[in-house]
Structure formats: structure tokens, C-alpha cells
From Swiss-Prot:
It is found in: Cytoplasm. Gene3D superfamilies: Ribosome maturation factor RimP, C-terminal domain (2.30.30.180), RimP-like superfamily, N-terminal (3.30.300.70). Keywords: Cytoplasm, Ribosome biogenesis. This is Ribosome maturation factor RimP. The lineage of its organism: Bacteria, Pseudomonadati, Pseudomonadota, Betaproteobacteria, Burkholderiales. CDD domains: YlxS_C (cd01734). Required for maturation of 30S ribosomal subunits.
């Protein structure tokens, strides 16, 4: 069984989603996980790390160190389910081939539409002449990531009051 398939099968059984697997130098294996309803906390990473360590031992997976982490605020988007889940949020999208001389776009994700196998994802962005809508398929996508939203205003009234 392929490593990614092995990890994905294990995570699915545990109620998690595999976001990405990275093999780094010196035998480091990084696994990024998510959970649609609650997100991921450190205890989730510990639980997954312990389970994967056992699975890798049984399956004779060669690695030196295992890191399990959440995908972060700038989570990669790879599947139709990702684009459906994060519709309405801002993302940076890079296409394989340019559209009107442009490959990189930042805008609001529109949920995928179309027949199965022909789904198109929408991205509402600010074009040269105002708001525009980009439509693309997963096969046209090079990479996409959420744009982190950091709201420090919520902490303004906390702490020392003068």
C-alpha cells in the first residue's frame, strides 16, 4: 500500500482528514491533518502521532522522525470538498496556465458547480475593470491556499484597562 493511502486510511478511521504528507531531509515525515467540525488541537496531533507510529511499525514504513500538525491558517486547498467547505472565504490561487496573462489570483471562493467530473470552481476577485469571476477546474489548478484572517481587534478590550 502506498504511504499516502496508508496514512489516509488510518486517519479516516480516526475521524480526521489528511491534508498533506511531506517527506523532508534526514528521514523527517510531516503529516498535516484536519477535522471539519472542530479543527485540530495539540491532543489530536498527539493521538494521531501515536497511532501512526504503531501503524508504521507494523507496515515497516521507513522514517526517522514523525511530525503531525494542523495545516495552519493558510491551509492548502486541493479537493472539491475543500473548495466547498471553504466557500465564502478568501484564497490565493495559482493556475497552471495564465488566463489573460495572469496565473495568480486572490479572491473569494465560490462553491463548485457543474456535473460530476465537470465541476468548475469560482473565484470572485478584483479585476482591472472591477469585480470579476474566474472559473477553473481542479486540473487547471497548480496550487491554492486560504488567506489567513487575523483579527486582533477582539483582544482590544482585554488586558489592562486604564
Amino acid at each position: 500500500m502506498h504511504l499516502t493511502d496508508l496514512i489516509e486510511k488510518t486517519l479516516t478511521a480516526m475521524g480526521y482528514e489528511l491534508v498533506e504528507v511531506e517527506r523532508a531531509p534526514a528521514g523527517l515525515l510531516r503529516v498535516y491533518i484536519d477535522q471539519a467540525e472542530n479543527g485540530v488541537v495539540i491532543e489530536d496531533c498527539e493521538k494521531v502521532s501515536h497511532q501512526l507510529t504503531r501503524v508504521f511499525e507494523v507496515e515497516n514504513v521507513n522514517y526517522e522522525r514523525l511530525e503531525v500538525s494542523s495545516p495552519g491558517l493558510d491551509r492548502p486547498l486541493r479537493t472539491l470538498a475543500d473548495f466547498t467547505r471553504f466557500a465564502g472565504l478568501e484564497a490565493k490561487v495559482t493556475l497552471r496556465l495564465p488566463v489573460d496573462g495572469q496565473k495568480n489570483f486572490t479572491g473569494i471562493i465560490q462553491a463548485p458547480t457543474g456535473e460530476p467530473g465537470q465541476e468548475r470552481i469560482g473565484l470572485e476577485f478584483e479585476g482591472k475593470e472591477g469585480p470579476a469571476l474566474l472559473g477553473f477546474t481542479l486540473s487547471e489548478l497548480d496550487r491554492a491556499r486560504l488567506v489567513p484572517v487575523l483579527d486582533f481587534k477582539g483582544n482590544r478590550n482585554k488586558g489592562n484597562k486604564q
